[in-house]
Amino acid sequence: REGKAEYEGYHYNLPYNGEDGTGLGKPLKSILQADTSIPIYTASITNTGLATSAELADGVFPVWMNPDRYDVFEPSISKGLQKADKTLMDFDIAPFVTCILGDDVDFCRAPIKANMALYIGGMGARDKNFYNDYAKALGYEDAAVKIQDLYLAGKKDEAAAAVPDELVDATHLVGPKEKIVERLQAWKAAGDKGHVGNMLIGAGQPEALELVASEML
């Protein structure tokens, strides 16, 4: 809002000045008052994306994460923070965490496995799937290959079944109360180190949200 919106770049120009334009475009100044206190987040799990987010944004949504494996992110995030002269205290790592409370752990894991199989197996071409690469970086290389093979072959149920229990348990909160409470300790420890800022909890059960809130707040 400090001036008119003008830009001359390699791909884009404001106002548009192409040969097929009318030539009537004028740079405008916004009449709206921007709220600069609203934080800016990006969604990323790639090295370049994480570094860029740490440098330019206020936080990142890394889809899901294992709070014990900040080492997967650390080099990229540190690179971006250093470039911007920031620290982890200036940056929010906010993963999506699904919480499903129940005594049947396999039943609780099932919908999460289906979702993770979609990302690890089907989000992108065989040789260019960032989520598949991410699962490998977390230590599940063989499983990631198997999930992708099954998913791209149209065997979605088998792909979901191939998602390791350990991967679900590491990145989400599933099962009986005692199991969830125990796993929350790792998230607390990661929060104390600045490795996690906000947990974006997804839960269809009020009691699941209440459990997480009672332990974390």
Predicted region positions:
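Internal, glycine-rich beta/alpha segment that forms the wall or movable "lid"
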Residues: R1-G59, V63-F91, V145-I147, K155
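C-terminal amphipathic alpha-helical "assembly" element
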Residues: A54, D58, W64-S78, V105-I120, ...
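Short, conserved secondary-structure transition motifs
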Residues: A94-D106
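Residue-level marker for beta-strand->alpha-helix junctions and adjacent short loops that shape enzyme
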Residues: N47, P67, T98-I100, P206
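A generic structural motif
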Residues: L88-P95, R126
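Active-site mouth loops of central-metabolism enzymes
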Residues: A34-I45, C99-I100, L167-E178
